[in-house]
């Protein structure tokens, strides 16, 4: 059972339920909306939404388009008409797998990484959308599962949950990682096309702009975020909660010269990724990434978002 209810600060509510009589229905509606195969793929006034779910999700605030073989084709902020989706490896809702093969030995290969998170000969693989499943469609939310073919995994899917009457999207990556001795990482892009926004995270309870509000000469490649990240603008801002994965990577998805922090504003405009899995640091992390995992996120719009 799902429903929406608004609460004032410190307000308490008691909910109860009771059996309701079944709603009356017409045996014959004279409306063609579903065929004998029980597939609702007919455009009709009776059901305007179900026939479109294999291609897109939409509410008052967002439009998400997707196509098998093409992946995510659109992530639209409807109020402004702005396309939030970025290209290449920054495409939202699309998982990435990166692998550096062991060509010497496991320790020497990791030493040669230096400050980079991948080797000079690393390869990055982007998930390819191969199937779409409608899990739930109701008056409160709709859930759609996007199945991706992703190197290094036996299963990879992203479940989108869009609320009908809230400016909020929840999304979950489900992954079955295969066994490999290579240096590996799994990412989910969190970059949005908001060039005027400032990117904030909370680190140690303190809001900061990565690449700007940190010590000169310090690392800018990866960060630990207490709760997630915020794209802050003068009006409406976008909050992304990284509920299960505090590690973020910022920068190009390739081996590159390392620039230490010089506090320039441009540092805050770099691509950002949720760094879900890695076995880069063998002293701190599990070397074997194989197994099943589920990692949840939530994106929502906020008006005049403060930093505390």
Residue positions per predicted region:
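C-terminal (or distal) subdomains of carbohydrate-active enzymes
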Residues: 1-308
């Amino acid at each position: 059972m799902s429903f929406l209810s608004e609460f004032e600060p410190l307000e308490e509510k008691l909910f109860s339920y009771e059996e309701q009589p079944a709603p009356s229905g017409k045996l014959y509606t004279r409306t063609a909306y579903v065929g004998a195969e029980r597939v609702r793929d007919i455009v009709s006034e009776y059901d305007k939404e179900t026939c479109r779910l294999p291609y897109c999700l939409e509410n008052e605030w967002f439009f998400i388009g997707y196509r098998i073989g093409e992946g995510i084709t659109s992530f639209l902020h409807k109020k402004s008409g702005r396309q939030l989706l970025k290209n290449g490896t920054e495409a939202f809702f699309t998982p990435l797998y990166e692998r550096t093969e062991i060509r010497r030995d496991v320790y020497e290969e990791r030493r040669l990484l230096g400050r980079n998170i991948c080797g000079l000969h690393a390869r990055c693989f982007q998930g390819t959308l191969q199937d779409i499943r409608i899990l739930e469609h109701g008056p409160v939310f709709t859930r759609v599962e996007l199945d991706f073919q992703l190197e290094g995994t036996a299963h990879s899917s992203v479940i989108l949950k869009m609320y009908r009457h809230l400016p909020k999207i929840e999304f979950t990556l489900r992954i079955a990682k295969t066994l490999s001795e290579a240096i590996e990482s799994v990412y989910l892009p969190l970059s949005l096309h908001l060039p005027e926004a400032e990117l904030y995270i909370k680190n140690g309870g303190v809001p900061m702009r990565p690449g700007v509000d940190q010590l000169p000469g310090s690392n800018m490649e990866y960060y630990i975020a207490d709760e997630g990240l915020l794209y802050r603008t003068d009006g409406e801002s976008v909050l992304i909660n990284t509920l299960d994965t505090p590690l973020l990577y910022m920068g190009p998805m390739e081996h590159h010269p390392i620039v230490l922090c010089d506090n320039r504003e441009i540092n805050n405009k770099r691509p950002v990724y949720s760094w879900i899995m890695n076995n880069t640091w063998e002293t701190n992390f599990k070397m074997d990434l194989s197994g099943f995992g589920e990692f949840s996120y939530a994106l929502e719009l906020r008006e005049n978002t403060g930093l505390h």
